[in-house]
């Protein structure tokens, strides 16, 4: 259960995915995120934001084909196996997620990202929604699962929490601090 909570790392590849339906998150994408925000934190939940979540519930758009029952025609972004392997070998992540139907891209035949994640016992989240509401850095993501026996997957409820804004945070703690000081002063004034 502890592996189902972690710092949110949102990898924004919307521009690249809009130009290439079969785009795959690369090691360069991950390193570019780190150049902007710092090292991916231990226990991170790394999620690709390709903008695909806006295509739901239109199956033709989600699967990138008119033949939504023929997997050989699927076109949607995912993680490149080198990026998944890099995360497994070099970062202590808890979860990988995508806003598409699979962590592997649509044209995958052997599903190497699934294999890499499974071998490392790292859950993969698919069809994650509302990613534009989460900052690329600074959220805490929790994955609530249902109990299944002998299942390889199932529905989840994924949610992100954000720290309070600095103004709100400071004002709350300033009020608490001033109240504490007032109580201490009143104790000294009333003491004989």
Where are these regions (language model features)?
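Active-/binding-site microenvironments in catalytic and ligand-binding cores
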Residues: 1-167, 186-192
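Cleavable N-terminal signal peptides of Sec/SRP-targeted secreted and luminal proteins
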Residues: 176-189
């Amino acid at each position: 259960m502890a592996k189902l909570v972690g710092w949110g790392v949102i990898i924004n590849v919307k521009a690249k995915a809009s130009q290439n339906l079969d785009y795959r998150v690369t090691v360069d994408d991950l390193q570019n995120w780190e150049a902007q925000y710092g090292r991916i934190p231990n226990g991170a939940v790394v999620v690709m934001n390709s903008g695909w979540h806006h295509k739901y519930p239109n199956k033709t758009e989600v699967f990138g084909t008119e033949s939504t029952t023929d997997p050989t025609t699927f076109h949607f972004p995912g993680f490149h196996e080198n990026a998944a392997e890099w995360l497994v070998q070099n970062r202590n992540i808890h979860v990988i997620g995508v806003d598409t139907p699979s962590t592997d891209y649509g044209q995958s035949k052997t599903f190497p990202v699934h294999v890499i994640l499974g071998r490392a016992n790292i859950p993969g989240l698919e069809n994650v929604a509302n990613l534009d509401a989460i900052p690329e850095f600074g959220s805490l993501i929790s994955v609530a699962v249902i109990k299944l026996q002998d299942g390889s997957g199932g529905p989840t409820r994924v949610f992100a929490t954000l720290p309070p804004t600095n103004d709100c945070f400071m004002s709350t703690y300033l009020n608490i601090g001033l109240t504490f000081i007032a109580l201490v002063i009143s104790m000294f004034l009333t003491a004989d």
